[in-house]
Amino acid sequence: MKIIVCITGASGVIYAKRLLEVLKDRAEVNLIISNSAKKIIKEELDIDWKEIKKLATDYYENDDFFSPLASGSNKFDAVVVVPCSMKTLSAIANGYSANLIVRVCDIALKERRKLIIMPREMPFNSIHLENMLKLSNLGAIVMPPIPAFYNKPKNVNDIINFVVGRVLDILGIDNSLFKRWGTV
């Protein structure tokens, strides 16, 4: 399985890091990190973004339109934008492919490949909601990283694992990162 993971400039880069850790031995992962996300990685995780880069099979700069990822002829199974800033959400919803992250999402939509968008904002305004609805109507899976509490999380890692486990479910990757409903 070939998955493109895109990290944008919103809070919640811990979700991306954990997803990459879990996918490392399970899929070919192409990674794109926006410039804002590079700063947020340092702020939230106290690590250099290059540490995140090491978790991927391949890495591409967000302005690299000569990347093989920039073409619809490049085969991949899914794109996950985690976290997804409202700027990126708007660009994807409105077809404004000004960078490689938005371009690969545009390709996923036009080629009918799996696109998971994980918007990280609170509260949402009407524009955010309209953009999410537009993407959902186009076939994207809009998946805000909202944890469950029926599984009685003991710490932040349990909360992160629930969200990442649900992403893996949508990707069709078996996992036991969290306790499922009815097994608690």
UniProtKB/Swiss-Prot annotation:
<keyword id="KW-0637">Prenyltransferase</keyword>
<protein>
    <recommendedName>
        <fullName>Flavin prenyltransferase UbiX</fullName>
        <ecNumber>2.5.1.129</ecNumber>
    </recommendedName>
</protein>
<dbReference type="Pfam" id="PF02441">
    <property type="entry name" value="Flavoprotein"/>
</dbReference>
<feature type="binding site">
    <location>
        <begin position="85"/>
        <end position="88"/>
    </location>
    <ligand>
        <name>FMN</name>
    </ligand>
</feature>
<dbReference type="InterPro" id="IPR036551">
    <property type="entry name" value="Flavin_trans-like"/>
</dbReference>
<dbReference type="GO" id="GO:0106141">
    <property type="term" value="F:flavin prenyltransferase activity"/>
</dbReference>
<feature type="binding site">
    <location>
        <position position="120"/>
    </location>
    <ligand>
        <name>FMN</name>
    </ligand>
</feature>
<dbReference type="InterPro" id="IPR004507">
    <property type="entry name" value="UbiX-like"/>
</dbReference>
<comment type="function">
    <text>Flavin prenyltransferase that catalyzes the synthesis of the prenylated FMN cofactor (prenyl-FMN) for 4-hydroxy-3-polyprenylbenzoic acid decarboxylase UbiD. The prenyltransferase is metal-independent and links a dimethylallyl moiety from dimethylallyl monophosphate (DMAP) to the flavin N5 and C6 atoms of FMN.</text>
</comment>
<comment type="similarity">
    <text>Belongs to the UbiX/PAD1 family.</text>
</comment>
<feature type="binding site">
    <location>
        <position position="150"/>
    </location>
    <ligand>
        <name>dimethylallyl phosphate</name>
    </ligand>
</feature>
<feature type="binding site">
    <location>
        <position position="34"/>
    </location>
    <ligand>
        <name>FMN</name>
    </ligand>
</feature>
<keyword id="KW-0285">Flavoprotein</keyword>
<keyword id="KW-0288">FMN</keyword>
<dbReference type="InterPro" id="IPR003382">
    <property type="entry name" value="Flavoprotein"/>
</dbReference>
<feature type="binding site">
    <location>
        <begin position="9"/>
        <end position="11"/>
    </location>
    <ligand>
        <name>FMN</name>
    </ligand>
</feature>
<feature type="binding site">
    <location>
        <position position="166"/>
    </location>
    <ligand>
        <name>dimethylallyl phosphate</name>
    </ligand>
</feature>
<dbReference type="GO" id="GO:0016831">
    <property type="term" value="F:carboxy-lyase activity"/>
</dbReference>
<keyword id="KW-0808">Transferase</keyword>
